[in-house]
């Protein structure tokens, strides 16, 4: 009987995610590296479009947030005062990090607000849905249950066998 038990990872840090997946996902850190110790607690991605309008009842704050064309277009439609207010409301939720898809330009106040709340911001060349799909797969691997077994591997008639 095995004494090993499957262990599901309860969280990973933003720094771990960035270090392990930056190349595959085309991630580039924007601004300071503060906040890389923040925890990602869910292996899924959120697009905070509805939250930007002020509706936070079901905001998925444990997830990586992604701005695509729709979110950035909405932000560009706001005057400077409203933009700052909306960004302050969003960043005050202390989500793990923000990813800007399509290498889209961002309002300067977005990076300023991220720095104020020490929230890492990344940029990727990938289109939004391709990034979300690839990042979700990467996160599922990071959060997958794992187990450790101690023993020796031997070859018995061409079949690998673990002897505990």
Task: Identify the role of each PLM range.
Residues 2-91:
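Gly/Thr-rich phosphate-binding loop signature of adenosyl cofactor/nucleotide-binding cores
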Residues 65-67, 98-99, 162:
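Structural motif
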Residues 73, 105-106, 160:
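Glycine-rich nucleotide phosphate-binding loop and flanking beta-alpha elements
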Residues 81, 103-105, 145:
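Residue-level recognition of alpha-helix initiation/capping sites
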Residues 94-97, 101-139:
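Charged, amphipathic alpha-helical linker segments immediately N-terminal to NTP-binding catalytic cores
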Residues 142-154:
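Pre-Walker A adenine-sensing motif
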Residues 157-164:
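Glycine-rich phosphate-binding P-loop
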């Amino acid at each position: 009987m095995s004494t090993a038990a499957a262990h599901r990872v309860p969280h990973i840090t933003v720094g771990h995610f960035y270090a392990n997946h930056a190349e595959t996902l085309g991630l580039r850190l924007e601004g300071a590296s503060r906040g890389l110790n923040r925890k990602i607690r869910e292996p899924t991605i959120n697009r905070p479009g509805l939250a930007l309008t002020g509706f936070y009842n079901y905001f998925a704050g444990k997830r990586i947030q992604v701005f695509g064309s729709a979110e950035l277009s909405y932000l560009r439609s706001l005057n400077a005062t409203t933009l700052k207010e909306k960004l302050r409301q969003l960043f005050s939720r202390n989500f793990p990090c923000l990813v800007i898809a399509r290498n889209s330009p961002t309002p300067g106040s977005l990076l300023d607000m991220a720095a104020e709340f020490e929230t890492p911001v990344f940029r990727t060349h990938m289109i939004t849905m391709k990034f979300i799909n690839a990042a979700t797969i990467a996160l599922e691997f990071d959060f997958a249950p794992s187990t450790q077994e101690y023993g020796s591997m031997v070859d018995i008639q061409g079949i690998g066998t673990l002897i505990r």
